[in-house]
Regions:
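Residue-level hotspots at or immediately adjacent to binding/recognition sites across diverse folds
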Residues: 1-329
Length: 329
């Protein structure tokens, strides 16, 4: 019995020594610190992109939430972040070439690059542009940049974005998109079914074009406009709204689609026209907009997509993430 008790006491003592030793090591032993850098992903799950553009054979840009700008020089195979210098939402982007591009966003923000995005500089719209949410920017066939947005904002730049001039009076309308017809007219589409056009070569005493309102059979917000040729154009909007003209915009017919999903953007490569929108919606027409295939960007894609750029058979679709696909798919 005494022998067994001795061994029990020895085990307890040994356990106590081990605990004390571990405690002493924890308090006194200093191991060299090693810092492991954590590199954030270029494209993260919480990213939201609002606009994209394809330039030339390999260059692509996308812009979005919190001032994020990404550029690819490998046809979308890899992306590099660029420093916008801002944290505001960037709503639209257009490019003259692989070096010169313009971005618009919230609070009248305009960013300009002439060096492939290595640097982005802020451009002032003037006092009347302060606080105005700019929603879209596009470049017409003459190289003039047009930016549109809330409170009737319509601005134009004739010097690759260095300076801007207001081209319409302030009004309580948000213009969501701007498009160009082959005869040189500029078309605007906006909330509550508003549509207007003007010839920018004919201006009043204030230097503004004389905008003419167009009545269409839609009262939902219109989000996109595109001309396919001199006679044919399309307008798309919320709740599956899709309008088509075959007489250069004199009259517009409603095209009934088997969907009530929102259509946020339209793009065409000359023979294929594609629209994207809410809950993964993707509509495709090979017939100049007379008939449409209605589906999804991908089978399990229920994300929203706000913009699409097309060049040849390649498509860049942006929204809750990036989707790149071949137009033949």
């Amino acid at each position: 019995m005494k022998k067994e008790k001795f061994f029990q006491l020895a085990e307890v003592a040994l356990s106590l020594l081990i605990v004390v030793g571990i405690y002493w090591l924890g308090e006194n032993l200093k191991l060299p610190e090693k810092t492991i850098p954590v590199t954030p992903s270029i494209i993260e799950g919480r990213d939201e992109f609002y606009a994209g553009v394809i330039v030339g054979e390999k260059v692509r840009w996308v812009v979005g939430k919190k001032g994020k700008i990404l550029r690819s020089e490998s046809n979308g195979a890899g992306w590099n972040p660029q420093n916008s210098g801002v944290k505001k939402a960037l709503q639209g982007i257009a490019a003259w070439d692989e070096k010169k591009a313009v971005v618009v966003g919230n609070d009248g923000l305009v960013l300009l690059t002439h060096d492939s995005g290595n640097t982005w500089e802020k451009v002032q719209l003037g006092n009347e542009g302060l606080g105005v949410k700019l929603l879209k920017v596009r470049i017409d066939p003459e190289g003039v940049a047009w930016a549109v947005g809330a409170m009737g904002a319509v601005y134009a730049s004739h010097d690759t974005g260095k300076s801007w001039r207001r081209m319409a009076r302030t009004q309580d309308i948000a213009w969501n998109d701007v498009g160009f017809s082959p005869d040189g007219k500029v078309w605007l589409v906006g909330e509550f079914g508003h549509v207007a056009f003007a010839d920018p070569k004919h201006v009043d005493d204030n230097g503004e074009p004389e905008w003419q309102a167009v009545k269409v059979s839609a009262d939902r917000s219109l989000m996109a406009v595109i001309f396919l040729d001199a006679q044919t154009a399309l307008i798309a909007g919320l709740d599956g709204t899709l309008l088509r003209t075959k007489d250069s915009g004199k009259s517009w017919e409603k095209i009934l689609l088997p969907t009530r999903e929102h259509i946020f953007a339209l793009a065409s490569n000359g023979h294929t026209t594609v629209g994207v929108g809410s809950r993964g919606l993707r509509i495709v027409s090979q017939q100049g907009g007379s008939s449409w295939e209605v589906g999804r960007v991908a089978k399990e894609d229920f994300n929203w997509h706000t913009d699409i750029a097309i060049k040849g058979e390649e498509q860049l679709i942006v929204g809750a993430g990036l989707v790149q696909m071949n137009g033949r798919e």
